[in-house]
Amino acid sequence: MAENKDEQLTDEELAQLQLAEENENAVDRLVQELGCPTRRIRQFAARVLHLLAERDPQRVVPCAPALIEALDRPEAQTRWEALDALAALATTCPERLGDAFEGAETALFDESSSTLRYAAFRLLCVWGA
């Protein structure tokens, strides 16, 4: 299954994901980039953290506060990637996600992005299961 998912990744995503799997400093850099003033960098960091959370949720558990904070970013993609990463953590550490509720609820009613609404719905379903 992971091979099929890897085929859908860009070369840059795959390279950063592999680096994050091997190097804790790379994960720390991605967390810092979630707060970057550049939208594209925030989106990319959230995407890689989402992919890493699906592969190895334990490596992303310490990033939960930064992912929750990313739910306040203006662009939908950063928020849906953060929601998807948090959904991957919901079965591992649901107790660390309490502060995500408000951001997920806000995203659930965001009329501008169906992808964002769906990501919020998935998080709330997995978290509540």
Question: Model-predicted segments: where are they?
Answer:
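Alpha-solenoid HEAT/ARM repeat scaffold
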Residues: T10-L14, D28, Q43-A46, R79-L83, ...
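Alpha-solenoid helical repeat architecture
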Residues: A2, L34-P37, L71-P74, L108-S112
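A contiguous pocket-lining binding segment that forms or flanks enzyme active sites
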Residues: E102-A129
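Structural signature of alpha-helical solenoid repeat scaffolds
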Residues: H50-L51, A87, C125-V126
